[in-house]
């Protein structure tokens, strides 16, 4: 079994949360200490921390940190302020369902507390539990995903659904780390992922840290690369999965799914059950965040487009369920019939947790 480095993105301390500043990668490896609720909110908005699970973990720690400083003995007042701060953090990224899931889980956990001190302790323990669980979930996703690949396969991915987007291992990148552990050779082709370049800055960086074979391409090279390099499969992460399997992920994912269909290769989505939002019936109900035009018109602070040009900058797109070969979760692989199978899988997990 190989030993190698898998970078981590979030760490809890009693007085602050430490994150890997993903905006500075790959040129600078910088860790930031977040001391306030506003620090955490800003880190999420500005993509210093990104990736749905990592956002959820960071927000959970941020809420626990803020609550630890409430100066009240009233449980009712504590709960009121907790919900207010929950809503503030939830506004940071409207598409990432793990953000709401983690925050709501903390709020629910604190409800059973008989005192303010008990509630504060409960929040910290619950946030830590979310991170520990996510690492285990990601490893199990990786095991299931790895079962779909064969030694020597060439696999394409977009954005960064890796270790630094989660507690550890990642979702779409998890099988590559586990393959490395087991001595199974796989090759990864990573799209640069304009306009913020998560594929170039983050995916290529973290896979290289672990010694995984990775080749970087620009987004508009995907079709030619699939053809010329005989790509065997495409695997992506997810920011939100609707009840029917429609999947919101980084902009460009939908186009990759269409290419997979055209070339007759499988298109896999890897995500934890917490990313499945049963309250969202179809992809049409998923809000798509639009980001600042400067992300498109500027590169490293330098303008690369004419001043005043109109810009459309959606951060995500939605891949229809019929283009998805399978959704890989910690509880197994779902092939089609998502509208029935996904709620069933989530219900089984909820029953297991309450049993």
From Swiss-Prot:
Sites where the protein binds substrate: 50-52, 93, 198, 249-250
Positions of the catalytic residues: 239
Chain positions of site Transition state stabilizer: 159
A GO MF label: S-methyl-5-thioribose-1-phosphate isomerase activity
Protein family (similarity comment): Belongs to the eIF-2B alpha/beta/delta subunits family. MtnA subfamily.
NCBIfam families named in the record: eIF-2B_rel (TIGR00524), PRK05720.1 (NF004326), salvage_mtnA (TIGR00512)
Protein's name in the database: Methylthioribose-1-phosphate isomerase
Biological source species: Geobacillus thermodenitrificans (strain NG80-2)
The organism's taxonomic lineage, starting at the top: Bacteria, Bacillati, Bacillota, Bacilli, Bacillales
Encoding gene per record: mtnA
């Amino acid at each position: 079994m190989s030993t190698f480095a898998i970078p981590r993105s979030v760490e809890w301390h009693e007085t602050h949360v430490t994150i890997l500043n993903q905006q500075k990668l790959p040129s600078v490896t910088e860790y930031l200490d977040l001391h306030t609720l506003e620090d955490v909110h800003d880190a999420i908005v500005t993509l210093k921390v990104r990736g749905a699970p990592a956002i959820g973990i960071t927000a959970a720690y941020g809420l626990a940190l803020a609550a630890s400083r409430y100066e009240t003995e009233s449980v009712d007042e504590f709960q009121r302020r907790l919900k207010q701060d929950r809503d503030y953090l939830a506004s940071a990224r409207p598409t990432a369902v793990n953000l709401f899931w983690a925050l709501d889980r903390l709020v629910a956990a604190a409800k059973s507390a008989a005192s303010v001190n008990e509630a504060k302790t409960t929040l910290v323990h619950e946030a830590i539990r979310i991170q520990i669980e996510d690492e285990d979930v990601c490893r199990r996703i990786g095991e299931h995903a790895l079962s779909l690949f064969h030694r020597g396969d060439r696999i394409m991915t977009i954005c960064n659904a890796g270790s630094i987007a989660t507690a550890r291992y990642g979702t779409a990148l998890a099988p590559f780390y586990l393959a490395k552990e087991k001595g199974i050779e796989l090759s990864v082709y990573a799209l640069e992922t304009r306009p913020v370049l998560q594929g170039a800055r983050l995916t290529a960086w973290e896979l290289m840290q672990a010694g995984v074979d990775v080749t970087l391409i620009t987004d508009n090279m995907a079709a030619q690369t699939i053809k010329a390099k005989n790509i065997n499969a495409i695997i992506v992460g997810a920011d939100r999965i609707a009840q029917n399997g429609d999947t919101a992920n980084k902009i460009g994912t939908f186009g990759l799914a269409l290419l997979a269909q055209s070339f007759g290769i499988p298109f896999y989505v890897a995500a934890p059950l917490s990313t499945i939002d049963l309250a969202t019936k179809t992809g049409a109900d998923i809000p798509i965040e639009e980001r600042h035009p400067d992300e498109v018109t500027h590169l490293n602070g330098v303008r690369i487009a004419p001043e005043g040009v109109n810009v459309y900058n959606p951060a995500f797109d939605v891949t229809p369920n019929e283009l998805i070969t399978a959704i890989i979760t910690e509880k197994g692989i779902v092939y089609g019939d998502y509208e029935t199978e996904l709620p069933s899988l989530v219900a089984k997990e909820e029953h297991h947790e309450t049993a």
